[in-house]
Amino acid sequence: MKFASLSVFFPAYNDAPSLPELLRKTFAVLDAHVADYEVIVVNDGSRDHTAQVLDALVRELGPRLRVVTHAQNRGYGGALRSGFAASQKEFVFYTDGDGQYSPAELPRLMECVGPATGLVNGYKLERHDPAHRVWIGSVYNFCARLLFGIRIRDIDCDYRLIRRELLDRMQLTSTSGTICVELVRKLELSGCGVAEVGVSHYPRQHGSSQFFRIRSLATTFVQLMKLWVRLVLLA
């Protein structure tokens, strides 16, 4: 039986080289496994030819592919918030537009959905990144568990399937990568069922991550502390 209703979206920043293969694979998976779906790409102020690539892909793949365009880069949190706001189906799945996760594993997340399930979160079976990124990711996961009581094993794995009605009830405010902590913390506090699935992680083939630049790391740290004050200290 096919999954009933699903929005899939990808935040994208200078991801033009990876988007064609990623989107074609996504449509193949959804055609086989989902009855009613839509695919959204949030072009977060890309400076490469992402816009032109997406225009061509809309012509190729048809009206089920929509593009949300930010004139200026709003950060990872801003891109996710736009993706959630644009999603119209019963469940929402998102992962990054850089191709480090494969849409082929999405059916494994869908299989975990039950009547009470609100979140199915992936976790990396093995991380294929440079050593400094692996170390920073481990520290970030540790801080998320220590400061926020996050129970999932990999907050840094952006491969998530979420019941949309839960998203509609919450107000997300983060503009950086801390949105993942805010999102999961609020979902766990809602009392919804949570499942976890191990997924493959692949080396990045094109471009570089925004998150691991000094300025981005500093912004993330400041926002993480502000989030802790609001969601934990003052809660």
Show where each model-derived region lies:
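Acceptor/aglycone-binding surface of glycosyltransferases and processive sugar-polymer synthases
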Residues: 68-86, 91-94, 100-177, 204-229, ...
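Donor nucleotide-sugar binding loop of glycosyltransferases
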Residues: 15-18, 46, 76, 102
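N-proximal low-complexity "stem/linker" segments adjacent to membrane-targeting elements
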Residues: 1-28
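Cell-envelope/extracellular polymer assembly enzymes that use nucleotide-activated donors
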Residues: 5-7, 38, 182
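Catalytic donor-sugar/metal-binding loop of nucleotide-sugar-dependent glycosyltransferases
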Residues: 151, 172-175, 184-202
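Short beta-strand/loop segment that forms part of the nucleotide-sugar
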Residues: 35-45, 66-70
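A conserved acidic beta->alpha catalytic loop
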Residues: 43-52, 99
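Acidic helix N-cap motif at the loop->helix transition within catalytic regions
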Residues: 17-21, 48-57
